[in-house]
Swiss-Prot record:
Family: Belongs to the complex I NDUFA4 subunit family.
GO cellular component, as recorded: mitochondrion; respiratory chain complex IV
The protein's name in its UniProt record: NADH dehydrogenase [ubiquinone] 1 alpha subcomplex subunit 4-like 2
One protein family per Pfam: B12D
PANTHER family tied to this protein: NADH DEHYDROGENASE [UBIQUINONE] 1 ALPHA SUBCOMPLEX SUBUNIT 4-LIKE 2 (PTHR14256:SF5), NADH-UBIQUINONE OXIDOREDUCTASE MLRQ SUBUNIT (PTHR14256)
Parts of the chain that traverse the membrane: none
Xref: InterPro entries: B12D
Amino acid sequence: MAGASLGARFYRQIKRHPGIIPMIGLICLGMGSAALYLLRLALRSPDVCWDRKNNPEPWNRLSPNDQYKFLAVSTDYKKLKKDRPDF
């Protein structure tokens, strides 16, 4: 047991206890979903600035009808008007 690799020990545990297969699947699904959500936040959020030289304040370049929220229940972004000054 001490010389067995991690993959071999994992495979042996799966063979002994097949009831943990759904748990492993759900854990992998949760980790994948969290990674995809973090990637979405990093690429689409106006709070994240990747290019400080050309776009130092990306939140000022958003138009009122840009939807950056993940879920908007009752807001129709196509009908919004600009109500803030240009900087």
